[in-house]
Amino acid sequence: MKISVVYAAPRQPLLFDCRVAEGSSVAEAIEHSGVLRYCPDIDLSKQKVGVYGKFVKLDSPLKEGDRVEIYQRITRVLDEDDDDDD
């Protein structure tokens, strides 16, 4: 079945279209897509994944046409001043 894997890389979003076996999981699709070779900084033990904007687990099964999304980790940066705008 045909699926897509999308990663919002720091410099530019990456899109990988690939074919996987029926019943493949999110993790299998990510591995098969090749995105991990292009972006070795991806850490699936820390980053969340989703399908069409909804968080899913790595073992979730996919359907034809699904778009797997690997989300960037969000970090909060505190400024050093005394205001409450953090």
UniProtKB/Swiss-Prot annotation:
The gene is rnfH. This is Protein RnfH. HAMAP family: UPF0125_RnfH. It comes from the Bacteria. It comes from Stutzerimonas stutzeri. Belongs to the UPF0125 (RnfH) family.
